[in-house]
Amino acid sequence: SSKTLQSLAELDGKNPTNRKLNVQTWNTAEGAKVLFVEAHELPMFDMRILFAAGSSQDGNTPGLALLTNAMLNEGVPGKDVGQIAAGFEGLGADFSNGAYRDMALVSLRSLSAADKRDAALTLFDQVIGQPTFPADSLARIKNQLLAGFEYQKQNPGKLASIELFKRLYGDHP
């Protein structure tokens, strides 16, 4: 244990190496802001798209952002949830999505070799641009969310968080 402490002591006073990121920014023709960091160290890329579509936008329909976001990868024309998952997996790609208070996001991590990248981007484009919202998935996910809401009613931490936001922001989303 003294060696561990000695090795940590060696770090005292040393500044960590700081890698400068070259962040390029631009706006698309549609007005979306793009932040881009190029790194050739790994043969892969990460892409995240953020939307101002979090739960604060739900209004009188609590859970709308969560439900909509959860349904994105449940189906596209010609593919069900299993085929979508297998498509990403077969390409070595990872699709993820989530909805939070102030935003919703979708992300893709894929190999950058053209054959893998292009196929992963095509599937990603279908998932976020052409979701079919299948009825069976809608019923299943809706039940999961309702069960989650019931659990939250019994969770002191969640109840405290709700009360805090209510006191801080009132009726403001």
Q: Which ranges hold each PLM region?
A:
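Generic detector of short, locally flexible boundary/turn motifs and exposed helical patches
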Residues: S1-K3, E10-P16, N69-V76, D171-P173
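M16 family metallopeptidases and their MPP-like homologs
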Residues: V37, E41-N73, K79-G129, K142-E150, ...
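General structural signal for secondary-structure boundaries
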Residues: S7, D80-V81, A135
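Peptidyl-prolyl cis-trans isomerase
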Residues: Q130-F133, L138
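Proteolytic maturation boundary segments
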Residues: S1-R48
